[in-house]
Amino acid sequence: MWDSLLTRCLPYGKTVFGFAGSDAHTTGRLNSCFMYFMLDEVSNESIRSCMERGEFFGATHTVISSGAIGPEQDVHAPEGVDQPLARVSSLTTEGHKITLCAGNADYVQWIANGKIIAKQELSDGKATLDLDTLSTADMLYVRCEIYNVNGMVFSQPIVIDRGSAP
């Protein structure tokens, strides 16, 4: 649904950010979804600023395979034990390249316009998507989902700027 909203709203200059929140049906699943903020300092102002700029990641210990986007199989981390997710240290753009740096990550799926455009294993905690190697004419955004056996961390959309935004 989020990708559908993005493809409908971005042409009008409206970015829809994704959030994660626990929808626990048992006490063992409390706090199974949460947010990571890329904070310079811990303050209400810094959190708000990150939210306004999309400098945060959603995280979940439960991921249902849809057959289109997401893992090949459902992910359900065990209840009541430490379940470390991928630790994103940076997501940067330089020219037409997007680079993800993350620890404790197995692979990343790059998604654009609701479709997986690339899947990469992280090499030394790093993966780079080179947009020059892809057909980007209709691409509105790129986002990524970072997986390990305990769940998934997802980025906010990186809007493709062609200099004609409303």
Model-derived regions: residue spans:
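Substrate-binding surface in catalytic domains of secreted glycosidases
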Residues: 1-10
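C-terminal functional module detector
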Residues: 10-18, 22-166
